[in-house]
Amino acid sequence: MSYKIDRKTYAQTYGPTTGDRVRLADTELFIEVEKDLTTYGDEVKFGGGKVIRDGMGQSQVRRADGAVDTVITNALIVDWWGIIKADVGIKDGMIFEIGKAGNPDIQDNVDIVIGASTEVIAGEGHILTAGSIDTHIHFICPQQIETALSSGITTMLGGGTGPATGTNATTCTPGSFHISRMLQSAEAFPMNLGFFGKGNSTNEINLIDQVEAGACGLKLHEDWGTTPSTINSCLNVADKFDVQVCIHTDTLNEAGFVEDTINAIAGRTIHTFHTEGAGGGHAPDIIKICGEKNVLPSSTNPTRPYTRNTLEEHLDMLMVCHHLDSKIPEDIAFAESRIRRETIAAEDILHDLGAFSIIASDSQAMGRVGEVITRTFQTAHKMKVQRGPLSQDSDRNDNYRVKRYISKVTINPAIAHGIDKHVGSIEKGKIADLVLWKPSFFAVKPELVVKGGSIVWSQMGDANASIPTPGPVHGRPMFASFGQSLIKSSFTFLSKNSIEQNIPNKLGLQKKCIAVENTRNINKSNLKLNTKLPNISVDPQTYEVFSDGELLTCEPLDEVPMAQRYFLL
């Protein structure tokens, strides 16, 4: 005979179920469980007197016969494809199944077999997301990687060689020597990494050399000269070798205007960085490029969201990043031309409409590497407060909005860079890069990060305490961050050509190297929940932004959630 319990008791024991709602951190965003794949009365839970014991929730099935390595029980999955309650099985570092875990000898509808070889991570009362992907990294210092990991980032793509002047300004790892050294350096870090070569050359052989050396993409940056001719040659090489091109366009309009850049791109797929323009790009109207179908538009997080401090902090940041001199009036004019309250305000709304598709950091080059996920959901909160529920949502929940925004830092950057077969979502067969959050700390501080099926980072108390919880509790690297476990749990993304040329073996790389693929035959319609193609115009005098004739504007926030309430410093 079944035993009935009320919803509150059930949620406290097994986590929320279908119809229950959860608040995300201290925002005004609420999600509602759409479906529960576990079975009422047959839920599995670990602990003294609980279900996962031999002959009960734990079966006699050996690992070789199908038992998983790890099960995350009763987690609330938040992904682009849904917000559901489920158990997640992990085997050989991959997502084995999403469904119902347990012992098939005594339980029905078991998708994930628990055996003596199975470890348990309790997901009850927690949110589970895919590890996030930051595609705008200036590799200025290696400490960025730990900071990113501690925020829930598990893949970083970008360029650089360390704190060189070029890297401080541009996300390029120029030439085969530097690409080789950065690929070798990647062996030391519990992070999926990939490096962009410098895309600014009208001689295609210079670009081919970098792709053959292992670059997973090419970056065009105005500080190296993003002219129509370099755009064309870079895209020609990308089309031949199936790598993505990222572009930071010509702020000063020296070699042409935004229309000339669009003509040079000529309908070919391209990832536009900081498409609003404060981070760089044709002033004042680069933002209109987000209406092109072949353009995959992203933002960087210094303008996310628009607040009362956004404009004030940008000028000094920009002067430092781009090696400008405050004593030179032309340098100041260059910087000021990029900082426009009107386009930054419009950027908020374009994200909410799904016209901007990706958010990344611009790490230490105006952006903050540990705040990508936080600022993404601060933007979602701001838009909920200022614009109300989306038409796809209701007064009960913000599910569609949350799925739209989680897509911007997970599946969409993965699709844009040809790695979505491996990372970017919680789906069967993908690498088990997973992040577990307490709802009250969602998008702020992960409770635990799983990398390639092993725990790589976790909130942890005093190592000399009698239990794991006494303070000071803070994020710390775990065993998968060290030794050969690190090598097996993290991956490096390279061009297919470089792998065929045996570059990983020539460089002595031990991490598994994965080829990027299908970067050229995609467009904005391939991205998830962020496919709108507005007709954008910008008033050249006032900088006001119009979408299909409608003015896009909003007020800055005086106070954001997920901020001082969570951080001492």
UniProtKB/Swiss-Prot annotation:
MF terms in GO: nickel cation binding; urease activity
Keyword set, alphabetical order: Cytoplasm, Hydrolase, Metal-binding, Nickel
Protein location: Cytoplasm
Binding positions (Ni(2+) 1): 136, 138, 219, 362
PROSITE patterns listed in its UniProt record: UREASE_2, UREASE_3
Residue ranges of every copy of the Urease domain listed in the record: 131-569
Gene Ontology biological process: urea catabolic process
Reactions mediated catalytically: urea + 2 H2O + H(+) = hydrogencarbonate + 2 NH4(+)
GO CC aspect terms: cytoplasm
Major site of localization recorded for this protein: cytoplasm
Protein's pathway: Nitrogen metabolism; urea degradation; CO(2) and NH(3) from urea (urease route): step 1/1
Domain of life, source organism: Bacteria
UniProt modification remark: Carboxylation allows a single lysine to coordinate two nickel ions.
Binding annotation for Ni(2+) 2: 219, 248, 274
Protein name per UniProt: Urease subunit alpha
Organism: Prochlorococcus marinus (strain AS9601)
Chain's gene name: ureC
